[in-house]
């Protein structure tokens, strides 16, 4: 509701503005001749190598990333990743999105991932992250597929993606703040649930094997 304009926050007014994602963004990905061989995937190295399988719940699972050496990192500055960047999968399971906010070392992209950077003040990357997670973008992908499965998202496809955004960055940031706080609450609850599940599993092992007897 918040990213579609159907519900407005108090204190904001004015019609939402229609923009085109591609016209207001720099969209980059690893090009074919820069392709990596599996031998170049390192367990430790200079830079993270972000692949589509590293996306988890809107973030990147850094613990699951491979690495590449310095030469591969500096080869293409266009796909060097920074905090505040937006990533979008374009191969395999297309349309997965991640917002980068906890990067603590150099990172670059493997094939199959776009980095999306705003080049105008039409939108903030964090607001666009929530748009791309919403039904707005899912409906767009569904229209692209025309009912069939699509296995690749091209840059030319994103040229067709028009959307409506709040007219000010202040409203975008206010919406983002609410959604981020909700995500944080969900994350904390999931962590607590995971902890309790592990405790339960441990108790089951003890109780069901007779290692611990009830008094």
Language model: regions and residue ranges:
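Amphipathic alpha-helical coiled-coil/heptad-repeat segments
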Residues: 1-14, 165-215
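A short glycine-rich beta-alpha junction/loop motif
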Residues: 5, 40-42, 90, 106-114, ...
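Non-catalytic DNA-recognition/assembly elements of restriction-modification systems
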Residues: 7-32, 164
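Proline-centric
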Residues: 10, 114-125, 138-139, 143, ...
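Structural detector for helix-capping/boundary residues
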Residues: 19-22, 53, 111, 135, ...
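Sequence-specific dsDNA recognition surfaces
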Residues: 22-39, 53-83, 103
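A short beta-sheet element
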Residues: 51-52, 67-135
């Amino acid at each position: 509701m918040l990213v579609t304009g159907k519900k407005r926050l108090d204190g904001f007014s004015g019609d939402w503005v229609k923009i085109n994602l591609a016209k207001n963004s720099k969209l980059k990905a690893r090009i074919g001749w820069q392709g990596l061989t599996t031998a170049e995937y390192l367990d430790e190295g200079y830079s993270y190598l972000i692949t589509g399988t590293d996306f988890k719940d809107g973030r990147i699972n850094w613990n699951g990333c491979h690495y590449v050496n310095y030469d591969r990192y500096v080869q293409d500055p266009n796909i060097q990743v920074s905090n505040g960047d937006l990533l979008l999968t374009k191969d395999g399971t297309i349309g997965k999105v991640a917002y980068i906010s906890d990067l603590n070392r150099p990172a670059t992209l493997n094939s199959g991932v776009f980095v999306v950077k705003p080049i105008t003040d039409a939108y903030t990357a964090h607001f666009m992250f929530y748009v791309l997670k919403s039904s707005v973008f899912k409906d767009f992908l569904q229209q692209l597929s025309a009912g069939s499965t699509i296995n690749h998202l091209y840059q030319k496809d994103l040229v067709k993606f028009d959307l409506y955004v709040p007219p000010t960055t202040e409203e975008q940031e206010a919406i983002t703040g609410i959604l981020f706080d909700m995500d944080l609450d969900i994350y904390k609850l999931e962590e607590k649930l995971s902890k309790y599940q592990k405790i339960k599993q441990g108790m089951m092992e003890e109780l069901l094997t007779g290692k611990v007897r009830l008094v």
